[in-house]
């Protein structure tokens, strides 16, 4: 999840958006969810990933970071 969080931070900054901007776009009462996404403490829902991708002008797979080795159980 940490890699996904780093991607969200990078893409948000590249888009010139603040956390407050995303909070307003999503209509969240607080920015807590966005901070949790960025810190890798939580993942956005599929719906929110699609919205993030549209905001950033990328595809969902540009946001999600997956460690293939750990996903399929391969030791490095």
Q: What does each of the following model-derived ranges do?
A:
Residues 9, 20, 50:
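Residues within the helices of the helix-turn-helix
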């Amino acid at each position: 999840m940490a890699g996904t969080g780093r991607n969200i931070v990078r893409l948000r900054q590249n888009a010139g958006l603040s956390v407050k901007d995303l909070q307003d776009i999503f209509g969240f009462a607080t920015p807590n969810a966005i901070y949790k996404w960025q810190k890798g403490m939580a993942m956005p829902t599929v719906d929110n990933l699609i919205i993030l991708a549209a905001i950033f002008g990328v595809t969902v797979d540009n946001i999600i970071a997956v460690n293939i080795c750990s996903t399929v159980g391969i030791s490095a």
